[in-house]
Amino acid sequence: MRILFITTQNPTKQGDLLEVSLLHGLRTVLGEDCVDYPRKKIMYHDFSDTPKDTLHGRGFSLLTTPIQDIKDRDIFNQKFDYVIYGDGHMYGEVPDIEGVNDLADGNVWIIDGHDLYGDAPRMISHNGETIIGTQFTNCFKRELVETDDDSVYPTGFGIPEERIRKVDFSIKDQLYQKTAPSDSLFEDTVDMGGGFSHHKFTDEEDYYDDLSRSWFGLTCKKGGWDCLRHYEIIVSGS
C-alpha cells in the first residue's frame, strides 16, 4: 500500500497533534511507501521555519527523535493507492491540490481533527449541545459522534512506542504531576485554551520524569485542549 500524505503548509500551524501523530505512525509502518508532501520539516528536526519551542506542547513526545527521510519525492511521477489530506483545512487550506488527487485515481481521504467545541463550517446539535460535526465524507474523524455515514471512520491521537516507560513504584514521591490542569484541582480555570502559560517544563525528559514520579496523572474535560496529555500520562506510568 502506498500513501501520499498532504501536510499542512502554513509554517505557523505545523504542530497539529493529529496530523503529526498519524504521519509518524504511517511512516513507521510503511516506510518509503508513505510520502509526505510538502515535506514536513519539523518531523526531520528541521525547525528553520518553525522553531520547536513555538509548537503546541513544545513538540514534546511526537518529535523526540526525527523520522527517517525518504529518497524519492518526485510525486508526480509516482502512483499511490490513497491520497490523505492532513488537517490543513482547519487552517484555511483547501484539501484539493491541482493534479494531486489523480495520483491515486481519485481515492482521496481527509483527516478531520476538529475538537467537539469551537467553530467550524458545519455545526450540529448533540445531546443538547451545539458541537462541531463531521466536515467531510471519505474522512477519518477525531471525536466522532455521528455514525450514519459509512465513509467516515473514527481516528485519534497516538504516541511513539519509544516514549513508553516501565512503571517504577520505587521513584514515586509525589501525589500528582506539576502540570495538572487547575480545573482538575477544583481551582479557578486559568490554563485552558492552549498557549504556553501551563507549560512548566522546557526539557522533555524533565517533563516525563515528573509524570513518572507521580502516583496519579490528573486531567479533566477541556474541549480538546492538550489531549496528548492523556497519552503522556499513561506511557509515563503515572
Task: Annotate each predicted stretch with a short phrase.
Residues R2-S238:
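Nucleotide-sugar donor-binding catalytic core of glycosyltransferases
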